[in-house]
From Swiss-Prot:
UniProt-recorded name of the protein: 3-keto-steroid reductase/17-beta-hydroxysteroid dehydrogenase 7
Keyword Metal-binding: no
Name of the coding gene: HSD17B7
Protein modification: Phosphorylated.
Glycosylation site positions: 37, 178, 229
Positions of the catalytic residues: 193
Membrane association type: Single-pass membrane protein
Length: 341
C-alpha cells in the first residue's frame, strides 16, 4: 500500500524540491500537492509524473491564509483518503521584509557576525496585515491555517498501530524574544516571521504531548538560507548573484547557507525516513552545507519549555472555538438571506 504524503506549498521553493527528492528516493509514494495556485500545481504535477511515471501525484487546492479554504480542502481530503502517513507543513510567507542596514553594518564588525548571518537575528523586519478571517496574516498562514488543517485531518492521522508524522518547516530565526503568549499573533511587533516560527516550534512540542499516544508525532526542521521566492523578497536575484562569491566563502564558517532548495530539504527528507517515535520532540533538525558543498544534518535544542507550549496550544484551541462559532454564524446568516430571496 502506497504511503500518502501531503505537502503544503508544494509548487515552488523548498516544497517543490521536497517533492522531487522524495520521489527520487521512492517513486511508489502518493504525493498530494496542497497548493493555492492551481495552474502552478497542475504544471508541477505533470512534470513530476513525467519524470516518475510509477508514482501517484494528486492536487488539492488550499490557501492556509483562508480558513474557509482550509475547511474545504480538509473535507475533500477526508473523502479521498483513509489515512495520511505524513504532512509537510511547509507553506509560509515573509511579507515586505526590510533589511536593517545599520544592524548589518555593525554586525559585520562584531563577534556575532557568523551568528548574525546564520539566523538573520536583528537584520529583518516585516510588514503584516489583517486577513479576511480577522487574523494577522503571517500568523494565520504560517501557524493557524496549518493548525486547523491538522485538527480537521485528525481522523486520517491518528492510528496508534502505524504512526503518522507532521514535519514543520521552521527556521533558525525562530526566537523566544520575538514571541509573547499575550500577543501570539504578533500584532504589536515588527518581526512576525520570527514569532510565527517560534510558535510552530511550540506547537510541535504541544502536539507531541497531546497526540503521541494516538500515533501522531511532530518534528521541526530548518532548511537554512536557500534561494527561493522568500529570500528573493529580501534582496532581488541579481544582488544575491553579486553576493554569491562572498557567501560561498562565508559558508566555510556558517553552514546555514544551503543556498539551493535541494540542499535545504536535507533535514526534511531525513526526518521522513526516521521512526518518528525515536526522535526527540525538543530538538530542531537543521539542514547544513559545508564550504565544499556537502550536505549534512545538525541538531539544536529548542529554546522553549513544555508548559509554555501547552499554554500556547490551549490558546489556539480557544481561538479555534471562536473562529468556528463566527463561521457558523456567518453561514447561518447567508442561508437566511438566501431563503428570503
Amino acid at each position: 500500500m502506497r504511503k500518502v504524503v501531503l505537502i503544503t506549498g508544494a509548487s515552488s521553493g523548498i516544497g517543490l524540491a521536497l517533492c522531487k527528492r522524495l520521489l527520487a528516493e521512492d517513486d511508489e509514494l502518493h504525493l498530494c500537492l496542497a497548493c493555492r495556485n492551481m495552474s502552478k500545481a497542475e504544471a508541477v504535477c505533470a512534470a513530476l509524473l513525467a519524470s516518475h511515471p510509477t508514482a501517484e501525484v494528486t492536487i488539492v487546492q488550499v490557501d492556509v491564509s483562508n480558513l474557509q479554504s482550509v475547511f474545504r480542502a480538509s473535507k475533500e481530503l477526508k473523502q479521498r483518503f483513509q489515512r495520511l502517513d505524513c504532512i509537510y507543513l511547509n507553506a509560509g510567507i515573509m511579507p515586505n521584509p526590510q533589511l536593517n542596514i545599520k544592524a548589518l553594518f555593525f554586525g559585520l564588525f562584531s563577534r556575532k557576525v557568523i551568528h548574525m548571518f546564520s539566523t538573520a537575528e536583528g537584520l529583518l523586519t516585516q510588514g503584516d496585515k489583517i486577513t479576511a478571517d480577522g487574523l494577522q496574516e503571517v500568523f494565520e498562514t504560517n501557524v493557524f491555517g496549518h493548525f486547523i488543517l491538522i485538527r480537521e485531518l485528525e481522523p486520517l492521522l491518528c492510528h496508534s498501530d502505524n504512526p503518522s508524522q507532521l514535519i514543520w518547516t521552521s527556521s533558525r530565526s525562530a526566537r523566544k524574544s520575538n514571541f509573547s503568549l499575550e500577543d501570539f499573533q504578533h500584532s504589536k511587533g515588527k518581526e512576525p516571521y520570527s514569532s510565527s516560527k517560534y510558535a510552530t516550534d511550540l506547537l510541535s512540542v504541544a502536539l507531541n504531548r497531546n497526540f503521541n499516544q494516538q500515533g501522531l508525532y511532530s518534528n521541526v526542521a530548518c532548511p537554512g538560507t536557500a534561494l527561493t521566492n522568500l529570500t528573493y523578497g529580501i534582496l532581488p536575484p541579481f544582488i544575491w548573484t553579486l553576493l554569491m562569491p562572498a557567501i560561498l566563502l562565508l559558508r566555510f564558517f556558517a553552514n546555514a547557507f544551503t543556498l539551493t532548495p535541494y540542499n535545504g530539504t536535507e533535514a526534511l527528507v531525513w526526518l521522513f525516513h526516521q521512526k518518528p517515535e525515536s526522535l526527540n520532540p525538543l530538538i530542531k533538525y537543521l539542514s547544513a552545507t559545508t564550504g565544499f558543498g556537502r550536505n549534512y544534518i545538525m541538531t539544536q535544542k529548542m529554546d522553549l519549555d513544555e508548559d509554555t507550549a501547552e499554554k500556547f496550544y490551549q490558546k489556539l484551541l480557544e481561538l479555534e472555538k471562536h473562529i468556528r462559532v463566527t463561521i457558523q454564524k456567518t453561514d447561518n446568516q447567508a442561508r437566511l438571506s438566501g431563503s428570503c430571496l
